[in-house]
Amino acid sequence: MTAAGRAAIALAGGPSGAPAGPGALAELIGASLYDAVTRHRTRYLAAYELALESTRQPALAGAMSRLGAAALGSTLAEHRSLGLPTTPGQVQALIALYNSTLMTLVVAPPGTVTAEAALVLARCLVTGVLRPEVDH
């Protein structure tokens, strides 16, 4: 995450410097999804191709696993730096849902995904993950 991204989400938490909340997190994720689908579309298509190839090559699978673990650690650290109270399990769920959402968006025809659509999906993602667990 860039310094500008951290500043934007920190500001979204409120002028008092309060920690960022779910709304700010959804805004950040929505912007990230849209940026990935537009400016970095080819990069993410290649990353998904690589992930699929890792199912056939054990050495690549190991490297992808290490990459995933590093992504979890760095994302959790970013959440802490922003004052987000997400648990490691919630961060892992956010990453999984982000990747699934990004895959859906990146295979859509170029130019068809809007920033608003990415934000709606991001809000659903954050709401679902951060919702208090309900006893069954």
Tell where the protein language model's regions lie, with residue ranges.
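Short juxtamembrane and helix-loop transition motifs at transmembrane-helix boundaries
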Residues: 24-28, 51-54, 121
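Hydrophobic alpha-helical connector segments
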Residues: 2-44, 91-94
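Short alpha-helical scaffolding segments that buttress acidic/His motifs in well-ordered protein cores
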Residues: 33, 47, 51, 94-101
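Hydrophobic/aromatic-rich alpha-helical bundle segments in the mid-to-C-terminal region
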Residues: 61, 65, 79-136
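A short secondary-structure junction motif
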Residues: 4-11, 74-78, 101, 105
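Amphipathic alpha-helical segments used for helix-helix packing
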Residues: 38-58
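Short, solvent-exposed amphipathic helices
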Residues: 63-70, 74
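Charged catalytic carboxylate motif
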Residues: 28, 46, 70, 93, ...
